[in-house]
Amino acid sequence: MKFQNTSGAVALALLSLAFAPQPAAAATVITDPAAFVQSVYARLAKGGDYIPPEDIYTPHLAALWALEGREAHGEVGRIDFLFWIDGQDGTPTDLRLRTVPVEGRLDRRIVVATFKNGEQAEALKFYFQKGVSGWKLDDVVSLKGQAPWTLSVILKYGWVD
């Protein structure tokens, strides 16, 4: 039996695999808004640099994020904090969640999150809209903290005094 030198062929095959297109990350599907919010806070409570996925927004909120990014011209932009914790850093503790239905609209839901970021008591309302690809985050409103805010307003107009 005659053996051929296959090391070159093996190397070429491995090299082509290394540069082959990788499958895209699976899209985030939110089947339960409260469970999703809970999972984000569980990850944030562990510390580190966890950033929630970017494909969780309604087209309206996604467009405002894109606008904010374009108008920032590579700089920090209008959002200079992690809205999930209403701060630049910190670890959320004492999380409590409550789901509020929207009267007459089964495709809308509000999740109210109360927690502490350090010693600061926080309360955020997460507004979700259900579409063909599941639930998507449509807006966030801070009810406590240092200064109340609405995410969509900051993204479009900046901080309004």
Write out the residue ranges for each language-model feature:
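Low-complexity, intrinsically disordered terminal/linker segments enriched in charged
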Residues: 104-109, 117-122, 139-161
